[in-house]
Structure formats: structure tokens, C-alpha cells
């Protein structure tokens, strides 16, 4: 027994101490008062974060790849007590046995990524990416986008229509290649002509199969003009992907907007995303969550109509992506998502807008056909790159 050790309760010397935890020999026990003393003192680091409600130090609760979660464990914290009071009778009984099913304590999520890493997904440029140097005409490319994107036909059905209706010899692989070439240019067109976004944004995720595994498309919508403001694709539904999508959605919100509101479902990744944007960009972003299918709280009741808008957008998105039956590469999903956003914002009339498109352009007003509008969009997009 080291002579430097003594009981921290009754100050008994080392002769009255013995190791209490076997081979680890990291804890001793006093023979006189039977209290425990560690062999080596813990080094306590100063607290990194504090609870804004009770000013109690937060402890590291969970460590993830892109985030670290800090939690307040004080039982008399005003935030915790207020959430306890909101529980109904059934929830209080459940809380006695399954307290881990409730999120009542204050959490703070520290993000491990930088603003430079928050890059919106974009289609890759193909080696033969010049849409004006293809073997077919620009009109044929516009026809492919009309049937494959605007009408939601699969690549094989699109090739069938071209061969048997228009007499154009094109394989389904040609349809896919041309779509990816066009998506590279349309992505920059979408970002350049998105216009001002509403101070209220609503978002949700849709999934698709890429090489047999789930990928997620984070879609954000402006409820007033019904236009897509963000369409980020990611293999994970983590905080980094949610932050990237939300950051792009509010990028064109007017600077004089006093308050920006983001409405999402109960996905936990959106909470640290809103915190990160408020912290790094000095934004005034308010995050609202619509939980479940029933209005069990006032927040869900107030913002559920906006959540239903994004659900209808997801239904439309799946109509255009389901014919693909999955993708071999991520670039396929990113490309069709980009082209869908182009179609939805600039070509698809909306009943709520008196059958106008969400993002009207003067260059497209005098063009009557969809293929003509696609051709004009490609010309404008090519001039941006």
C-alpha cells in the first residue's frame, strides 16, 4: 500500500487501508470508517457549456461522428420541470418505468464540421459534358427531359417513345447519360434563378435506393410561392446533411427579415442544424417541429398545414423517381433530383398559384411547348458555366 494514501473521510493512514477492487487496484477502503478513496485523483476539466436555464454545467452525454451532445442533469432545472408538467397522466405513468423514452432535459449539440464542409450536393460533370456536342440535336435532348423528367417516364419507356413515336434512335442508356449531362448545367441554373425565399421554410426527407442502400433527399419548400429552395442528397440523415439543406433553403431569404422559421418533422438532426446556423451566421432562425399524425400540442396544430405541403411535394417527388427503381450511383439520384427541382420550379403550373409556375421567367413566357422550354433553360444554364 503506498504510504501517500490516507482515508479522505477519517484521515486514517495507509496501514488501515486495503485495495477494494481486485486487480485494478484503483480504489482503497478504510478499515475504520469503511469509506472508499480513489488511488489517483480525477483531473476535472472546466465545464465547456452551461445550461441557459439553470446555469448548471453540461456533461458530455453522447459522442458521434459529426456531433457531441451535452446534457443538463440537474433535477431542479426550470426547463426540465416545465417539460415534466406538460406530461399527461398516461405519459407520467410511462415515465416512471421508461424515462429514456422522453426528452425532457436541456441538450446542446456541438457540431464537428465547418461551414466550408457544408456543400450542397451537385451533379458531377461527365467527360463528354458538352450538351451542344452530342450526336443528337438539342431538340431531342429536350424531348428526353420532357418525357423522362416532366412526365415521369422511366428511361426505357422514354427510349421506347422516342423510337416508336418520333423515330429517334436512342437507347435507355442514352437517356440516362443525357439526363446527367443536363443536370450538371441545370443545378447552377436552379441556384441562380431561385429568387427570394419566404421567411417560412418547410422541409422533409424522401429516400431512394442507391446501390442497394438508402439515400436521402432533403427537400425544402417555400409555402407562399410553392417553390423548392433546397434539394440536398446525402447517404445519412445526420446533422451535417440537415444543416447543409437548411442553410441553402434560407440563403436567399431577404436580409431585412426579422425572423425566419423552419418547420420540419421530429427528426433530431434539425435541432442542432438550427442551433449551428444561429451560432455561426448570426441568424434569427426559429425551428418548429410537427410530431406524429395527430395534433397533440399547439405547435403541431399551428404548423401542420405547412407539413402537409411538404408531404405532397414528397409524393410528387416519388412519382418522378420511383420509375427508376433505384440507382447504381449517387450521381443518378442527385441528377434526377436536380432536374425534378428545375421542372417543379420553372415548368410545372400550380393550382394554388392560379396555374402559374412557382418561379416565372420572362425568357420562357412566349414558349408554348415543354420541350421548347427545356431547350431554352439548357441554353441559359450553359451560359452560366
Language-model-detected regions and their locations in the chain:
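N-terminal alpha-helical interaction blocks
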Residues: 1-29
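Short, positively charged, Gly/Tyr-enriched micro-motifs
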Residues: 11, 34-200, 205-211
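Conserved beta-strand -> loop -> alpha-helix junction used to position metal-binding or nucleic-acid-contacting
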Residues: 28, 266-268, 276-305, 309
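Active-site beta-loop-alpha junctions of metal-dependent nucleic acid enzymes
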Residues: 180-181, 231-255
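Acidic/histidine-rich, metal-coordinating catalytic segments
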Residues: 257-271, 293, 357
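Short amphipathic alpha-helical "interface-anchor" segments enriched in bulky aromatics
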Residues: 302-328, 333-337
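C-terminal domain-tail junction helix/linker
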Residues: 323-385
